[in-house]
C-alpha cells in the first residue's frame, strides 16, 4: 500500500479474512481511515493492538497461531485500498473496502476497486434496489449490490461454494466504465477482475507462498524483489480467481474490446 501511496491520499482501508476459524468466531474484519495520513493511521492502530497483546503475553510473536486468534488483522487474505475520491464525499464511510455480512461465510463479501462507473442508476434498477442517499453517492455501493445479488443466487445453487466465474459473468456486463475490482468472500475465496477495455490497470504475481495483485507492476516488483517478467498483466475482461486452498485460475469473463489504456 505504501508503494502505491501516489494512487490515492483521501483515505485508506483494509479487509482481512481468516481461514479455518472455529465456528462462532469472527473471520472477516475491516478497518478504514480518512486521517491526513491514512495508511500510517491504519498500521499504527494495528501496531497498537499487537503492543497491547504483548503486555499480557510477551512471547506472543513466537506463536503465530495464537496471535491469529487474538489479532483481527492477522490472517490469510488481505484486501487493501487507497482512496482517490472521484465520486461521493471524502467521509470515511466512502473509503473502500465495502462489506456485506451474512450468517453463511460464502455470502460475506468485501469489495474494493479502482473505477468510475457512469450508470449507477441502471445498476440499482437491474436488481430492483431502491438506493438510499448514501448509495446514490457511491459507485462502489451500486457495484457491491449487483455483485452480492448474484453471489447470493450462486450460493443458493452451491451453498458456501458459489461459482465466482458465474457471479462475475452475470454481474459485470452492465458495468459501464473502467474498473479493476477485488473481492474477498468469507469462505476464503477471492478474485480480481479488469474491465473489457483495460481502462484501469491490473497486475499479479504468484509463487509457492503468495498470490498478489495490484494496480502497479512496480509496486509488486519492489515489494517482492522480483523481475519485470515475473509480474504478469491481468488482461482486459479477465479475472484471477483463487479458492481457499490457494488454487487459482485465469478466467475470461467478458470479451475483450478495443484497448483504451
Where are these regions (language model features)?
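Conserved short alpha-helical segments that host acidic/polar catalytic motifs at enzyme active sites
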Residues: 1-261
Amino acid at each position: 500500500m505504501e508503494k502505491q501511496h501516489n494512487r490515492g491520499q483521501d483515505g485508506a482501508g483494509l479487509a482481512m479474512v481468516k481461514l479455518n476459524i472455529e465456528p462462532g468466531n469472527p473471520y472477516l474484519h475491516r478497518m478504514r481511515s480518512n486521517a491526513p495520513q491514512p495508511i500510517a493511521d491504519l498500521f499504527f492502530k494495528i501496531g497498537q493492538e499487537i503492543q497491547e497483546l504483548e503486555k499480557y503475553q510477551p512471547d506472543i510473536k513466537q506463536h503465530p497461531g495464537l496471535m491469529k486468534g487474538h489479532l483481527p488483522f492477522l490472517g490469510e487474505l488481505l484486501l487493501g485500498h487507497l482512496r482517490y475520491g472521484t465520486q461521493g464525499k471524502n467521509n470515511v464511510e466512502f473509503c473502500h473496502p465495502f462489506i456485506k455480512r451474512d450468517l453463511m461465510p460464502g455470502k460475506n463479501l468485501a469489495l474494493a476497486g479502482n473505477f468510475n462507473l457512469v450508470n449507477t442508476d441502471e445498476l440499482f434498477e437491474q436488481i430492483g434496489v431502491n438506493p438510499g442517499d448514501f448509495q446514490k453517492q457511491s459507485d462502489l455501493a451500486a457495484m457491491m449490490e449487483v455483485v452480492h445479488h448474484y453471489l447470493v443466487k450462486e450460493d443458493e445453487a452451491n451453498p458456501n461454494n458459489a461459482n465466482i466465474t458465474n457471479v462475475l459473468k452475470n454481474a459485470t456486463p452492465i458495468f459501464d466504465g473502467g474498473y479493476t475490482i477485488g473481492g474477498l468472500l468469507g469462505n476464503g475465496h477471492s478474485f480480481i477482475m479488469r474491465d473489457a477495455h483495460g481502462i484501469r490497470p491490473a497486475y499479479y504475481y504468484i509463487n509457492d507462498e503468495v498470490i498478489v495483485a495490484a494496480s502497479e507492476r512496480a509496486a509488486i516488483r519492489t515489494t517482492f524483489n522480483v523481475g519485470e517478467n515475473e509480474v504478469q498483466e491481468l488482461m482486459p475482461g479477465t479475472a484471477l480467481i483463487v479458492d481457499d486452498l490457494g488454487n487459482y485460475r485465469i478466467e475470461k469473463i467478458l470479451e475483450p474490446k478495443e484497448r483504451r489504456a
